[in-house]
């Protein structure tokens, strides 16, 4: 008990400090993004795009909600990119995932996409700019899908302007054919952020996020009832730049909701919510540090990180429920460009379940390291260039 109370005081003091001074609700994933877009300077030319993503993500979790495990491997994504028009790019390739210690290639995906761009707007059909590119919150859209579901197929509309980011997409997760023994699965999503103030002394924005997961269909022979699960988030982000070794202070806070719109009750809860409160700072050279406080009530998410949910996905305790969840997570991250086109990303995230009695609280943690290589090589030069 003597060790618990000082820890409680330290955590409580830290929360007060970072919430008062103001961080990014999640670790920035800029280095993980790789977008191929039409380019007027490359019209008529053929390129080979190479995207290599090496990952090690380890969960030292011992709770009843999310398993402890390690993902360790590499992904390779070679694609041919034809810049058919200043506003049009066509891509074709393949995605390979190799898990270290496993036999052969764990999984491969064909890659086809058509991308039309006009000004700040882009229409994508085929392989989406998915997972981390959606810029969604972990309770709604698990960051781990960058590894476990690296390829998404469907249609996507993106606006990336000075004061507005918008990503609206349909991810067709499971296609079925008559007569199918399983149901189709579709995920629709919206991720938007509107800048209200953006200058050298302050930036303030309002993010809105929404996912709708539907499982059903009319040509399946499964007896399972239809499911429609909705998650949404509304919040604000504030960043205050500095000129010293601390580059900026941040705060990002959300109210996240869950609603089960299914005709048949299959979930333990039909609706719920969670407060996702975050604060911290970025340094010039030493990475970023932030604190996250999660207070969930009957919260479920169709695609979110299991840790935040009130219903367990644990291999031993599946279905176990905790109506009220209260977590504190301390996040350290360091991103660095090592060479042209080569990036590294390191993360360490200890957490404590504040919903447990003081004497039984344990510090759990996750740690990750990523290495990314992103490059395009010209294979054919357009005539006259």
Residues covered by each model-derived region:
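Short, glycine/acidic-rich beta->alpha junctions
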Residues: 72, 104-106, 149, 184, ...
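Surface-exposed coil loops of outer-membrane beta-barrel proteins
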Residues: 122-193
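Beta-barrel outer-membrane channel/assembly domains of diderm bacteria
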Residues: 24-105, 110-116, 366-375, 384
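Subset of outer-membrane beta-barrel
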Residues: 81-87, 95, 106-122, 131, ...
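Short acidic/His/Gly/Ser-rich catalytic and metal-binding motifs that mark active-site loops
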Residues: 57, 132-136, 217
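Flexible, solvent-exposed loop segments that connect beta-strands
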Residues: 60-65, 138-139, 307-316
């Amino acid at each position: 008990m003597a060790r618990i109370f000082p820890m409680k005081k330290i955590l409580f003091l830290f929360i007060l400090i970072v919430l008062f001074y103001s961080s990014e609700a999640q670790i920035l994933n800029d280095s993980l993004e790789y977008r191929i877009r039409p380019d007027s300077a490359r019209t008529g030319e053929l390129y080979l795009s190479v995207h290599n993503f090496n990952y090690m993500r380890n969960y030292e979790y011992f709770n009843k909600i999310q398993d402890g495990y390690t993902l360790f491997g590499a992904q390779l994504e070679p694609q041919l990119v034809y810049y058919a028009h200043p506003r049009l790019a066509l891509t074709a390739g393949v995605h390979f995932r190799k898990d270290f210690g496993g036999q052969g290639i764990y999984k491969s995906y064909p890659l086809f996409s058509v991308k039309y761009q006009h000004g700040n707007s882009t229409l994508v059909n085929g392989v989406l700019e998915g997972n981390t590119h959606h810029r969604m919150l972990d309770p709604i859209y698990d960051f781990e899908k960058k590894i476990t579901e690296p390829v998404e197929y469907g249609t996507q509309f993106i606006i990336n302007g000075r004061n507005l980011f918008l990503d609206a997409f349909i991810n067709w997760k499971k296609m079925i054919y008559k007569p199918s023994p399983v149901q189709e699965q579709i995920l629709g999503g919206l991720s938007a952020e509107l800048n209200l103030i953006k200058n050298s002394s302050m930036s303030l924005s309002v993010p809105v996020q929404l996912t709708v997961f539907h499982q059903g269909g009319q040509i399946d022979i499964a007896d399972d009832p239809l499911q429609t699960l909705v998650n949404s988030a509304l919040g604000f982000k504030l960043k205050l730049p500095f000129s010293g070794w601390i580059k900026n202070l941040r705060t990002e806070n959300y109210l996240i909701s869950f609603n089960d719109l299914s005709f048949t009750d299959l979930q333990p809860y039909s609706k719920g919510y969670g407060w996702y409160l975050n604060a911290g700072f970025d340094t010039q050279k030493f990475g970023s540090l932030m604190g996250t406080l999660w207070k969930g009530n009957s919260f479920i998410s169709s695609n979110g990180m299991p840790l935040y949910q009130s219903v367990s996905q644990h291999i031993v305790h599946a279905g176990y429920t905790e109506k009220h969840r209260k977590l504190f997570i301390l996040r350290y991250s360091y991103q660095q460009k090592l060479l042209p086109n080569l990036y590294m990303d390191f993360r360490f995230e200890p957490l404590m379940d504040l919903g447990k009695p003081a004497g039984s609280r344990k510090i759990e943690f996750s740690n990750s390291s990523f290495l990314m290589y992103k490059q395009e090589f010209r294979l054919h030069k357009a005539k006259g260039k």
